A protein has these predicted regions:
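Charged, amphipathic alpha-helical coiled-coil/dimerization segments
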Residues: 69-130
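N-terminal helix-turn-helix DNA-binding core of bacterial DNA-binding proteins
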Residues: 19-61
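Short, locally clustered residues in the helix-turn-helix/winged-helix DNA-binding domain
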Residues: 11, 39-43, 104
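A structural signal for well-ordered alpha-helices, especially hydrophobic packing surfaces
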Residues: 14, 100, 136-140
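Exposed, interaction-prone assembly regions rather than primary DNA-binding/catalytic cores
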Residues: 122-146
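N-terminal leader segment of winged-helix/HTH proteins
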Residues: 1-28, 75, 126, 134-135
Length: 146
């Protein structure tokens, strides 16, 4: 089935991509899960634990554990909401922002090197991105309807 091959094609690139990205993250003493959450905070700050767990489709306890490590490493700060004391806003510290910028550059170099070895056009990449965003939105809706 074409749909099965479609999904499998994305799953098969995930592990090899992680293997290439891990040395970059190890160089900066950060794990892949921490990087994904740090990147999420950088893109959506100020944000909350609930928003991160929704966008990343991860359980709140998993996100909480990862956030604790990022806080302990002085990469993010937590501020209480003035309206709701239970709500806490997460932002990058200057150290976290610096790490985000450095890792982004290193990861972009890796990604550009991989793309350069293919014959993928900018239009093909954009179309793939659009399709993946559509699928991601549907999957998130399905996951939150359970």
């Amino acid at each position: 089935m074409l749909s099965q091959e479609f999904f499998n094609s994305f799953i098969t690139i995930y592990r090899p991509y992680l293997k290439l990205a891990e040395p970059i993250l190890e160089k900066h003493n950060i794990y892949y899960g921490q990087w994904l959450i740090l990147r999420d905070i950088a893109e959506y700050q100020p944000t909350t634990l609930i928003e991160i767990s929704h966008r990343r489709a991860i359980e709140k306890p998993t996100a909480r554990k990862t956030l604790k490590a990022l806080i302990e490493n002085d990469l993010i700060t937590v501020e209480n909401s003035l309206e709701d004391k239970r709500q806490k806003f997460l932002t990058l510290t200057p150290k976290g922002h610096e790490l985000y910028e450095i890792v982004c550059l290193d990861v972009q170099k890796l990604q550009q090197a991989v793309v350069a070895k293919t014959n993928i056009s900018q239009d093909q990449m954009q179309e793939t991105i659009n399709v993946m965003k559509q699928i991601h939105e549907i999957l998130l809706k399905e996951a939150h309807n359970d």
